[in-house]
Amino acid sequence: MPAARAAVTQTAGRVPLGLANGGDEVLIVVPWDADRVVQEAIARAYAERRVKAHVQYEHDLAGVSNADMAAISKAESLMQIGDGQQELNFFFELTGQVANPEAGREWIRQRDPDLFNATWPKARYSAQLEKISNGYAKAVEKALQKYLTDNPRISKVYMGLGARNKTRRILGDHADKFFGSYTYNNHFDLSSKVPEFPGDVWRLVETKTIEALAFADRLEVSDPEGTAIAADLTPEVAQAWAKGVYQQGHLYMFPSQATGRWPYSLIRYPAYDNDKGFLAPLLVEATGVIASTNSHRATHPRLEMHLDKGRVTKVVGGGWYGEGFRRLLDYPGTKDLTWPFFDRPGYWWLYEAGTATNPKYFKHPAEMLTQVPPRELLRGGNLSERNVAGVIHWAVGTEAEHGPEVAGKPSPKSIDFGKKYNVPIGHAMHQHNLLPTYQVRIRGTGQWQTLIEHGNLAALSDPEVRALAARYGDPDEILRKDFVHPIPGITIPGKYDSYGMNPGEWWKRWAGEIARGTSPYMK
């Protein structure tokens, strides 16, 4: 219960359950296999604050039995953590938002049957279960909206592990009730020190990290796995970036993602800052290489994504993920079409540098050992590590997440464009840099400011941040990073080349040792 009590008072980050006030009713939506003990603890902790929590399981909303969900999950769980091609799903679903994903996947099947079969293996189950699976997401969405209509006193909704702007759309006319993600499906985040990390300290860490961006004329990012990119910034780009960079727990540390949207308010989350207005999307000409062995969905053999003046020019390595990435570079329209609100053609522009800000998150070992159905893009996989402070997750795309018409909503022009050409109107092809160094040069001074060094947020050592943290206890303990990725040849003894050829096996072994209690890092 102490951890649950801390969780329901946390006001910062992805899961700000503490934004609910006494007398409120909130809705928490969890997957069918969420830990019921954890959910009961959260509901009881809320009740102590005089907040009524409606905890709804997705399958109950959709009218599907637990047994059917277990059978579907077993049939569809055909992938391991090392099957990096799972990340290709994001091009078509969720973040990529292709209007007709089946037609897009068929384009791959016709050109590369082996890649198609490796990425979308056929599940073996009855026609009845297949029908349930195919209609499950829509059934949950419809039932969720009805539940909110039938329970008008609910003022706040928490659900999903990420993609907050897209998750809120699932609520339809109730979208403004969406207040955050929900990562307490099991005990991992709840048993960490994330819930008790002081919310005002968390926000100060974030504002310290972004305060120099408006004055930057160049950014440079490197990483020991091989990333090295740079981009020059005009004053106009820097100003727009600074206006749109903020989102609790997920900073938009590349100007392209910070624009093409109505920015979040720094003080009234999750409200949008209407005073800043719609920020027209920008394309920034970054040049260099992004190298990785991890993505949102899985791990992959070391991959290099080469950039020239903002565009992807070449993909090297990466196993099946790299093979699929190279194939998709020729997807119809992605080189020659010009997306709505953009001034240059093409889809394959660097878009995202999502940056985590809490030093108490850690990589969940269970993700490395649990098979997850490929359609469940935001359940498990390899998502938890992107929440570790200092980790950057990159993605590409020509995305205007919102339109200028209505705050927080995509433009009908973007939606119609996507339907007309069956191209993604979002972002895709995530890559994680686990130990990046991120610097910006201050305009007119020649001085560089380091925002992240070898995966450590510089703001965690800032005197003002430490002074504020001292109000809650020992600042060394409060601000200490609890998890550093153990990468052979970089942070622990071993050969990186061997790791880079098959990182999935390394991470499975790492997780297995933790599960058995034999890990040298758990003494």
What are these regions, as identified by a protein language model?
Residues 303-305:
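Hard-cation-handling environments
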Residues 57-61, 189-192, 321-323, 336-337, ...:
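Short C-terminal domain-edge/linker segments immediately following a structured domain
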Residues 321, 388-392, 397-474:
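A hydrophobic, small-residue-rich beta->alpha segment in the mid-to-C-terminal subdomain
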Residues 214, 283, 296-299, 387, ...:
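Short solvent-exposed loop/turn micro-motifs enriched in small/polar/acidic residues
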Residues 166-170, 229-232, 239-242, 300-301, ...:
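Short helix/loop capping segments that flank catalytic or ligand/cofactor-binding pockets
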Residues 298-299, 314-405, 438-440, 474-486, ...:
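Dual-mode signal for accessory low-complexity, basic/Gly-rich regions
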Residues 1-285, 289, 294-295, 308, ...:
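Active-site bordering "gate/hinge" segments
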